[in-house]
């Protein structure tokens, strides 16, 4: 990825003429966009590049051209769906992520684990979890990370209604945060949450 340029004081993350994707053809083309503090949504149909954009923003996918500028702190991005994580326990996942984020909130993690019914699963390997519970492992870490920028890919997929409501409540509060950004990629944006920006792909 190109060397980041100084970031505007208005934004905690921004792109300049960013192009890239997982294959030879870029799903994201010449994207110039800025994300301020608050809650943001990236919408699009299947195959439009939602996940690719999050990976580009996180530095998990190299850009073909353009640049990403991030405020001097940290970005949370984690994908625990791959088979390489199957043998890792829930607690081990959290333990591995914790040192990367200096503002990690262990008390919040405990509260979220309780709210999302994951406390009893801490010692289980990820391969033993349902798709929804596996997603909760990432979500709990993301929300407890304290990262300046948190990237969430389809956070409600395969979740039970109680957990969806708990995540929605958290994001409603996050929308008012003065210095942190949550960027969510999903098919549709919620109609009852105050968004700082909405980007359609």
Specify the residue positions occupied by each region the protein language model found.
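A short, flexible loop at the N-terminus of ABC-type nucleotide-binding domains that lies
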Residues: 1-37, 62
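ABC ATPase nucleotide-binding domain signature region
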Residues: 41-44, 52-99, 189-191
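Conserved ABC ATPase "signature" region
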Residues: 106-121
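Conserved ABC ATPase signature
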Residues: 125-132
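Hydrophobic anchor residue at the start of the ABC signature
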Residues: 139
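A short, proline-enriched helix->beta-strand linker immediately N-terminal to the Walker B motif
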Residues: 144-148
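ABC-family nucleotide-binding domains
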Residues: 153, 159-160, 164
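Conserved catalytic loops of ABC-family nucleotide-binding domains
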Residues: 170-192
